[in-house]
Amino acid sequence: AFCEIEEFPRRVLAKHWPKVPQYHDVRELTADILARDGITVDVITGGFPCQDISVAGKQAGIGDGTRSGLWSECLRLVGNLRPKYALFENVSNLLAGPTDQPGAWFSRILSDLAGIGYNVEWHDLPASFIGAWHRRGRVWILAYSNEISRQQGVSKRPILRQRFVQEQSTRSFEKWPGRSNLPESRICGRADGVSDVVHRIAALGNSVVPQIPELIGHAILDAIKSERAAA
């Protein structure tokens, strides 16, 4: 299932995954609604708004009344649904801010997740990590329940680090599937029935480089395989 409030990204999602249900507002989404619709959850992924965290914004933080304060809704869903894994993304300044109390925003993220029984790994992975032509710094936060931590010995063997070292040394952006088929324009897209220049640029600004969450997904699968082999 998807949860997306903006119309243009919803159209893009519907184009690529027409049979996947979409919900509009994370503030209204609940475990009961998902259960009613027959949806079970193993993984939650999300990028909560960055406008109040980014160095380009006013850095109002993640408190109540801010757009970035939708983090609280992400946390609520993790606590209610108890997924095996939760993966969140935001701008790198989440690690550093606010200016008057460096690190306080991220300390809250860690405290919130620990408070509902989740351990956390995090990595600052820019797009250039996989060879893209721009930096696009982002922090990726992988949370997993304490039960998984005990089963996999995660505290001694982080899920992500080994996979990241492997990928960075063996694979470049040009080698990813479909890389040779990119359109000539890397901003405005093509006349594909969906693209609208203004909305597309805004959506690209809010989007992620998909190869990075794919890499993280493979790292999770590797950890699961290792645990099964050791069992």
Please describe what each predicted stretch is.
Residues A1-L29:
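SAM cofactor-binding core of SAM-dependent methyltransferases
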Residues F2, L29-D42, Q51-L204:
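Class I S-adenosyl-L-methionine
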Residues T45:
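Basic, amphipathic alpha-helical recognition segments used for DNA target recognition
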Residues F48:
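Glycine-rich, N-terminal phosphate-binding loop of Rossmann-like dinucleotide-binding domains
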Residues P213:
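Acidic-aromatic/histidine active-site loop/patch
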Residues A219-A223:
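Active-site catalytic microenvironments for nucleophilic, acid-base chemistry
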Residues S226-A231:
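Short intrinsically disordered terminal tails
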